[in-house]
């Protein structure tokens, strides 16, 4: 009976010692958090292993993340994964659709993003671009003649329009001289003509008798204006003037209208500020609705695909520029010892318990062996 009690005792003591030893060893990985002293002498094994080696641990964790976890090959493989790409495209489509179907005004959205000043800047930039384009256009075209400056199609239209212009002018002239206003104007012109020629007026009066000069001249003027020869004459005159104009420099226009006036007139006609303001007062949905389907079905997938392709091709450079090892090292270095302990235990809690149990099991087995040895020795 004493023998079995001895074996049970040695087994129990072995299990307790083995389990406690392993438990103590695990605790000493983290505890104590700070060095302990007896007088001026530091107690051995203080602080614990992990608190003592925290900086080295931070460096090694950083290397481990970069060299074994977040590797360029692993990330590149993920970026080219078809299922991942489909999921990302779908997510992007949903998020973009939320934005472009927003009923808030563009002005309100810009205010939320703290870029409300964009209206003023956009107006100034558009006016600047228009001004620069007009000035560049004028600088170039001022070196040309009108024949060089105007497109061939414009030349043809003008030349084809000259006979019609002649007919229009003559038609309006006939209509004018047939009116009372035209007759009155013609009468004054005749009176002015004969005012300094008194004898000639008397001579004409002898021939015309009681009929006024204007009554005789008016039908003739109208008849002259209605003749085909007159139309051809006016057409020839306009054609000659057009030929002269084609040979003149566009720069001569500056004599009548300065560049600044041209620019100012165009800017006033365009009304940039008013146009920008109206545009910003529209809702995001109003602006994007005409191209919504194109954005969702084409632009977003293409953008995501090209972005992922670029990311896959440059992943190594991106990771190098991110300095992930340094980031991990800095973050771990900022952890308190308590937090670091909780972090490690949250991952290895079950395994550390099994190590404690294993120590107890081995201690118990050693106790049994000791009991058997005592039995044989007796």
Curated annotation (Swiss-Prot):
It is a multi-pass membrane protein. Its main location: membrane. Disulfide bonds: none annotated. The chain crosses the membrane at residues 1-21, 357-377. It comes from the Bacteria. GO terms for cellular component: plasma membrane. Keywords: Cell membrane, Membrane, Transmembrane, Transmembrane helix. It is found in: Cell membrane. InterPro entries: DUF445, UCP032178. Belongs to the UPF0754 family. This is UPF0754 membrane protein BA_0862/GBAA_0862/BAS0819. The lineage of its organism: Bacteria, Bacillati, Bacillota, Bacilli, Bacillales.
